[in-house]
Amino acid sequence: MSVNDPLGDMLTRIRNAQLRGKSTVSSPASKLRAWVLDVLQAEGYIRGYEKKETENGQGELVISLKYFEGTPVIRELKRVSKPGRRVYMATKDLPSVRNGLGVSIISTPKGVMSDASARSANVGGEVLCTVF
């Protein structure tokens, strides 16, 4: 099955798995998805992930979800820049998610990073998603 928005598909899989209380969720592998998962792991929103090879050679990312006292750590996961409407922002315009309690994930020329990292590196880019 063809997916128009692979990153949006992965975020939806994570959101749905947490609503069901699953400990892990799988998603087809890609570099962008892995980079976003690296940021989520560094910010403490997921336990981690591992890449497993599949028969078709694409690979699969198995994501370990994180809970605190039975409640999902990720309360809100929103896709900002979509295939039909890309959202780019300069460093000074990067959004603050829930007054700094959440994180925006930005794709910059220096790689995929959190909004705080992008501000400290003084780079802007495409706002992929927000996490709270």
Curated annotation (Swiss-Prot):
Molecular function GO terms recorded: rRNA binding; structural constituent of ribosome
Keywords: Ribonucleoprotein, Ribosomal protein, RNA-binding, rRNA-binding
Summary of subunit composition and partner proteins: Part of the 30S ribosomal subunit. Contacts proteins S5 and S12.
Biological source species: Cereibacter sphaeroides (strain ATCC 17025 / ATH 2.4.3) (Rhodobacter sphaeroides)
Origin superkingdom: Bacteria
Protein family per UniProt: Belongs to the universal ribosomal protein uS8 family.
One GO biological process term: translation
Protein name per its UniProtKB record: Small ribosomal subunit protein uS8
Cross-referenced PROSITE patterns: RIBOSOMAL_S8
Described function: One of the primary rRNA binding proteins, it binds directly to 16S rRNA central domain where it helps coordinate assembly of the platform of the 30S subunit.
Encoding gene, per UniProt annotation: rpsH
InterPro entries with a match to the protein in the record: Ribosomal_uS8, Ribosomal_uS8_CS, Ribosomal_uS8_sf
Gene3D superfamilies, A to Z: 3.30.1370.30, 3.30.1490.10
Upper lineage: Bacteria, Pseudomonadati, Pseudomonadota, Alphaproteobacteria, Rhodobacterales
GO cellular component: ribonucleoprotein complex; ribosome
